[in-house]
Design a protein with these regions (language model features):
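Alpha-helical transmembrane segments
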Residues: 1-9, 82-283
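Membrane-embedded alpha-helical core segments of multi-pass
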Residues: 2-10, 27-42, 61-71, 87-93, ...
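Transmembrane alpha-helix boundary signature
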Residues: 13-19, 36-50, 99-104, 159-166
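Membrane-interfacial loop-to-helix junctions in multi-pass inner-membrane proteins
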Residues: 16-27, 52-53, 57, 81
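Hydrophobic mid-bilayer segments of alpha-helices in multi-pass membrane transport proteins
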Residues: 25-30, 259-261
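Membrane-interfacial loop-to-helix junctions in multi-pass transporters
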Residues: 53-62, 114-115, 177
């Protein structure tokens, strides 16, 4: 709760006064540190069985995960309804898996992660009709950083505090789901963040300096409208996130085949914007 209060206060100040990147980073570290001090930390990682973290590494890694999640969601919030749609779908996949763990395996931490995921779904679903193109209400840094923090919190509660040894029944992939699933849920924002950092640092600019070369900007340049661009990026998020979840319930070859077909379908949709189809008909 303290971490959420800090991030909300930071977001309000940023939305009102436009804080510089170092100041925002310090505030985000304080929020992540407060969350870690309250016990929401990575205790172990599902690497070669169970790799237990020492207290210092646990806190530092937790802060890093929270910072990445906050800024990934914050950077992807560039179109009406985009951040809310991606987080809602990603939280839906996380809810499905954490609910399964809390009911089938009785993990208390999974139950808390389920609650946070359900809250995120409700927050985004209630906000989205007002934030859809043409938006009447905007999320701002306050909202995007808050839902990024909550995504990180639910992921940490499942990834680093649920022992993977009891999940898989001897099969390998489901044991890695607690660490794979958070990455898959934030795959689109994380990819956008990574490309932005590489792009800006290569140009000698700050990684936090704004530009018009994000994934959603590229979709707009291809000829998609804002609504279609949001739907395409949300579809990719849902495909990757629910594809990861499905590995716990169906044979991996079925998941792989379905995901591959989905990627082809969504990529074809993304590379065939309306203006290109109109041009093809007129030529």
């Amino acid at each position: 709760i303290i971490g959420c209060l800090i991030i909300v206060a930071l977001g309000i100040l940023d939305d009102k006064f436009g804080l510089d990147a170092p100041t925002k980073l310090v505030g985000q570290i304080l929020a992540a540190g407060a969350m870690a001090m309250q016990g929401v930390t990575l205790v172990w990682l599902p690497i070669r069985g169970t790799f237990i973290l020492d207290p210092t590494t646990s806190v530092l890694l937790t802060v890093l995960v929270v910072l990445v999640s906050i800024n990934a969601v914050n950077m992807v919030d560039g179109l009406d309804g985009l951040a809310a749609s991606i987080v809602m779908v990603g939280a839906g996949a996380f809810f499905a898996y954490s609910y399964f763990l809390s009911v089938a395996n009785g993990y208390q931490r999974a139950a808390l992660a389920t609650l946070i995921s359900a809250s995120l779904i409700g927050m985004c679903a209630g906000f989205l009709p007002h934030n859809w193109f043409r938006a009447r209400v905007f999320m701002g840094d306050t909202g995007s950083m808050l839902i990024g923090l909550l995504m990180a919190a639910s992921s940490i509660m499942l990834t680093g505090q649920v022992d993977p040894a009891g999940l898989s029944g001897g099969t390998l992939l489901p044991a890695f789901l607690p660490i794979v699933l958070p990455l898959s849920i934030l795959a689109v924002p994380l990819l956008d963040l990574l490309l932005a950092v590489i792009r800006r640092t290569r140009k000698g600019r700050s990684p936090f300096a704004p530009d018009k070369e994000h994934l959603h900007h590229r979709l707009l340049k291809l000829g998609h409208g804002q609504e279609r661009a949001v739907l395409i990026m949300t579809a990719f998020t849902g495909l990757i996130a629910f594809g990861a979840v499905s590995t716990a319930f169906v044979p991996i070859w079925i998941t792989g085949l379905g995901t591959a077909l989905g990627v082809v379908a969504i990529a074809s949709w993304a590379l065939n914007p309306p203006k290109l189809r109109v041009h093809a008909r007129n030529s």
